């Protein structure tokens, strides 16, 4: 059984999509049968980046949408005709925020991965920064985002499918262990079918 762990630690930035696609392609060439994607402590990043990554994993269809206070809706949909069909687990925690929650929420809505860990942060808003003439800037909210099934994450977060606490004094990563056990169980079932 060959499963691998992929960490997206820092944030979803402009280069993350190509790095992700390249890593997934390399792992598939190696014959992986399961994948753990670790977005614990990932504060988020660029909405388009996470949408492009999800487009590579999910079937064609709605990935995420944003809605302004006035009701204007913008949809991000999958269209690249690529879908990753291996058992997956996504690790999250209370420091998984914003784009990380979009990722986890979409994977959960499409039932593409088991979400494992603790409740995510709950930052379901899109913000922008406007520079001021004195050199300072103002950051303000322009929209809320929603998962494909319309889940509003703001102030609530994403609830994992399997809640697994990771105590500060833990000597092993029990969340990662739970993900590997989940994948081993999924692969045993598919091998028996």
Predicted regions and their residues:
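Short, acidic, Ser/Thr-enriched surface-loop or helix-capping motifs
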Residues: 147
């Amino acid at each position: 059984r060959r499963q691998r762990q992929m960490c997206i630690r820092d944030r979803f930035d402009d280069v993350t999509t190509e790095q992700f696609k390249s890593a997934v392609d390399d792992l598939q060439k190696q014959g992986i049968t399961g994948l753990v994607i670790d977005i614990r402590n990932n504060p988020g990043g660029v909405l388009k980046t996470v949408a492009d990554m999800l487009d590579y994993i999910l079937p064609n269809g709605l990935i995420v949408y944003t809605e302004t206070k006035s009701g204007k809706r913008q949809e991000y949909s999958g269209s690249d005709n690529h879908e990753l069909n291996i058992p997956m687990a996504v690790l999250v925690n209370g420091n998984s925020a914003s784009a990380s929650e979009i990722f986890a929420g979409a994977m959960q809505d499409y039932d593409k991965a088991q979400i494992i860990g603790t409740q995510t942060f709950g930052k379901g808003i899109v913000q922008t920064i406007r520079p001021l003439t004195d050199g300072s800037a103002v950051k303000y909210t322009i929209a809320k985002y929603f998962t494909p099934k319309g889940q509003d994450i703001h102030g609530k977060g994403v609830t994992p499918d399997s809640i697994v606490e990771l105590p500060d004094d833990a000597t092993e990563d029990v969340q990662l262990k739970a993900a590997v056990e989940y994948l081993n169980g999924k692969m045993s079932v598919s091998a028996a079918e």
